[in-house]
C-alpha cells in the first residue's frame, strides 16, 4: 500500500491567492503584459518617461479604480486593490512604486482626508491620470532621510508652475 502524500495544487494556489483571488489574478495578467515589463539598460530619463506611459496603460486596463468610491467609478474594494497592485512589482518595481504614489498616496490622501468637494473636484482627474501626483520623500544623490529633505517646491501663481530646487547634486 502506498502512503505517498499528495498535494492539491489548485487548493494551495487558491489559499495563497487569498480572499481577493480574482483581483490578484487580474494584477498578474496585467503584470505579464510586455508593455509593463522592465526594459534593461534604459537611462533614468527614459525609464521615468516609460513609467509615466505605463501608468496611462494601467488606467486603460481598468486597473486603478478599485479603491475609489462607486459614485466616482470605483468599486470601494481596498483589499482587492492592494492584492492586484502587489503583482506589479514582478513587471517593473518602478511601476509599482509610481502607481502607489499616484493612487495609493496622492489619491488616497484626497479620498481619506478631503471632503466631498475635494472628491468631486480632484478624484476623477487623479483616477484618470489627468492630474498626476507626487510624494516627496527621497532625493537623487541624497537618499530617503525624510527628516532631512532639502528639496523645496514653490508654486508660482503667475505661471501656474511649481519650481523645484534641490541643494543635492544627483
Task: Enumerate the predicted regions with their spans.
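Amphipathic, small/basic residue-rich leader segments at the start of a protein or domain
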Residues: 1-134, 143-144, 155-163
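Cytosolic ligand/metal-binding cores
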Residues: 138
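Short acidic, glycine/serine/threonine-rich loops at helix termini
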Residues: 145-149
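Hydrophobic/aromatic beta-strand elements that line small-molecule binding cavities or substrate pockets
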Residues: 150-154
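DPxDG-like acidic metal-binding loop motif
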Residues: 166-170
Amino acid at each position: 500500500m502506498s502512503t505517498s502524500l499528495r498535494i492539491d495544487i489548485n487548493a494551495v494556489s487558491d489559499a495563497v491567492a487569498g480572499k481577493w483571488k480574482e483581483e490578484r489574478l487580474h494584477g498578474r495578467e496585467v503584470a505579464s503584459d510586455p508593455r509593463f515589463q522592465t526594459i534593461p539598460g534604459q537611462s533614468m530619463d527614459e525609464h521615468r518617461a516609460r513609467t509615466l506611459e505605463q501608468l496611462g496603460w494601467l488606467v486603460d486596463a481598468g486597473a486603478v479604480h478599485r479603491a475609489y468610491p462607486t459614485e466616482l467609478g470605483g468599486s470601494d474594494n481596498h483589499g482587492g486593490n492592494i492584492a492586484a497592485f502587489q503583482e506589479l512589482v514582478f513587471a517593473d518595481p518602478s511601476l509599482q512604486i509610481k502607481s502607489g504614489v499616484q493612487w495609493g498616496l496622492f489619491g488616497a490622501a484626497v479620498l481619506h482626508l478631503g471632503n466631498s468637494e475635494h472628491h468631486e473636484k480632484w478624484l476623477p482627474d487623479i483616477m484618470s491620470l489627468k492630474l498626476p501626483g507626487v510624494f516627496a520623500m527621497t532625493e537623487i544623490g541624497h537618499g530617503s532621510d525624510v527628516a532631512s529633505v532639502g528639496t523645496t517646491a514653490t508654486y508660482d501663481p503667475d505661471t501656474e508652475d511649481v519650481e523645484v530646487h534641490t541643494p543635492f547634486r544627483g
